[in-house]
Amino acid sequence: MIYEATGRYHRDMEGVLDTAGHALVKVNPARARRFAQAAGYGAKTDRVDAAMRERMGAVLDLDARPVRSDCMHEIRELHVARIGLVKDRTACRNRLHGARNKIVLTQLRARLRQVETQIEQIDAELHRLIADDAGLAHRFGILVSIPGIGPVAAITMIVEMPELGSMDGKQAASLAGLAPITRESGKWKGKSRIGGGRRSLRRALYMPALVAIRHNAQLGQVYTTLCSAGKPAKLAITAVMRKLLLLANALIRDGRKWTETAP
């Protein structure tokens, strides 16, 4: 059964249909609309949308994915709330630099303390939920064993890519938008670029990649080799991000923690 993601509104439907044993395929609304335009579906009605999604599923051979558990829904909601609070904290700190009025300063400091307390509360609840779920706790333990990946990055990877460990390296890189996209036609060859995929996951892997370059000999060598070959530092960091993701995928697939000799 194919349906479009509609935020919280499709969660009850997912639960009922999953319990009934239906295979579910959730598609991004933007991707569905692009397919509709390419296939010549100009009108947009419930009947047209249903026919379009049926055709989309047949043409693209979309794979069904397991429905998120109630625990994962809670973790995702907390994760999204934490992202918003981190942005609020940054905004408060920036405003504090320019504030001079005593009332404004007092309010900003109080708001900053409140935000930091709320972040701590969310972090504690996230760790509790993960610790109470044996499967998630196992995945979390594997991820934080990798040099560079801390608790926040590990939770982001669990939330943004629950498929980790169930796919091959190419699929993982493609889903994260870290697979180079070749651009060539005839004799013309453009520069390969990354794009698409899950942007929030790429953002979460950036700082871990920088740490891994310093503390993981294998990934540090990848960075050094590319830079020595004249590649831009940004490209080398992206390559490390991709290697880091592939390493996490392989370790979760094999059910083992990172060691110095891990591939």
Where in this protein do the model-derived segments appear?
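A detector of single, family-specific signature residues
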Residues: 1-263
